[in-house]
Amino acid sequence: MFKTLTQNLTKIFDKLVSSGILTEAQIDAAMRDIRVALLESDVALPVIKDFIAEVKQKALGQEVIKSVSPGQMIIKIIHEEMINLLASSKSETKLNLNSKPPVNFLMVGLQGSGKTTASSKLALRLRNQNKKVLLVSLDTYRPAAQEQLAILANSVQINSLPIVQGEKPLDIVKRAIAEAKISAYDVVIYDTAGRTQIDKAMMEEALAIKKIVEPTETLLVIDSMTGQDAVVTASSFNEKLAISGLILSRIDGDSKGGAALSVKYITKKPIKFLSSGENLIDLEEFDAERLASRILDMGDIISFVEKAASIVDREEAEKTAAKLKKGKFDLNDYLQQMRSIKKMGGFGSILSMLPGSGKIMDQIDQSKLNSKIIEHQEAIILSMTPKERKNPDIINASRRKRIAVGAGTTVQKVNILLKQYKQISEIMKKVSKMNPKNLLRSGIGKLFS
């Protein structure tokens, strides 16, 4: 989401660091460049003014001008101020479950903001914390909206309130309250109707629902792709409904990122979650320090490790590790690794969490990061026989031609996959013979550069 902002800030930082001793004039110039970078990323003007003022005040201090590395000191100040801009207390960012069950959450937002998907993601997250969750759709206006929530709920074995055709939102709420008590649900998530724009009728209905439901959380889902409009939306909802927190959706999109840096500052309400993609596991707890590090191209290794841990099958990983110790790595293992990368959002998503990824992204062919490449490779491997996957060396020219036809691709693409497999196989075999303590010193990190 912050690709352009990250790249622009990285260029500014490179100038600062290479300058050595900094004058006040150079600091002023850097602040102007940062201001332009933030404006181009759709950050709200009041946010920019206060942010620049805070950074400049600290950057012009004698301890910075006289420090051994003034450029690095200013980057540190910017990092700290960005954390302050985004951060809320830990108690505020945590979901409020401190109420007698059933605990009610009210999801609000504009139509198309990703509210229904976010509701389902939140339900899955709570179910994985051993909570009994009921999903309730109150959107009786958008065609098939209730069915959409039911399908998403069913896909992850979460209960949704049965649909009664023609029922009004307030009547659905009353039925949900009764069902939650009878079936002893821990949490009920109400997915309210959205509109293409904010209107009086929408707000009045949401307010009436809120009075009946008495939610412990009223969560506004904001589409990160909407830029400056996100600030107007957040302000309006907060003014009318007194929201308790924010969920930023579509953070994996090609947006400028200004919404994330503005909505918390304007509403004074915490960002609780970041949502990406359609996969229901892709909901991450918001952490200001991690996001600030990602924006400033310092990487987010913690999120990388957490995401990997959540999608990797431990039993399969142990089997692969055991095979590697014996110097074995076949195309079944390669396919498993590709699928894990796909679940993590593809190569681009992984790279974005690594330090210095902004510069790397500039230097590589973006088409090579396309998740479709993984799907094509998957199709090629699945067109092979079990014997071929286990013994890739037997795949001769005629077999390659047959595999290409089966996968609907070219022999050249099959050759590329087999070449990549061979390279990775050689690396894996070398890694399996290494002492874990020597892995970092061996330059294994260069595989990602």
From Swiss-Prot:
UniProt GO BP: SRP-dependent cotranslational protein targeting to membrane
Localization in the cell: Cytoplasm
Transmembrane portions of the chain: none
CDD domains hit by this protein: SRP_G (cd18539)
Catalytic activity from the UniProt record: GTP + H2O = GDP + phosphate + H(+)
Enzyme nomenclature, EC number: 3.6.5.4
Record remark on domains: Composed of three domains: the N-terminal N domain, which is responsible for interactions with the ribosome, the central G domain, which binds GTP, and the C-terminal M domain, which binds the RNA and the signal sequence of the RNC.
Its biological purpose: Involved in targeting and insertion of nascent membrane proteins into the cytoplasmic membrane. Binds to the hydrophobic signal sequence of the ribosome-nascent chain (RNC) as it emerges from the ribosomes. The SRP-RNC complex is then targeted to the cytoplasmic membrane where it interacts with the SRP receptor FtsY. Interaction with FtsY leads to the transfer of the RNC complex to the Sec translocase for insertion into the membrane, the hydrolysis of GTP by both Ffh and FtsY, and the dissociation of the SRP-FtsY complex into the individual components.
Family that this chain belongs to: Belongs to the GTP-binding SRP family. SRP54 subfamily.
Protein name in the entry: Signal recognition particle protein
Organism name: Rickettsia conorii (strain ATCC VR-613 / Malish 7)
Gene encoding the protein: ffh
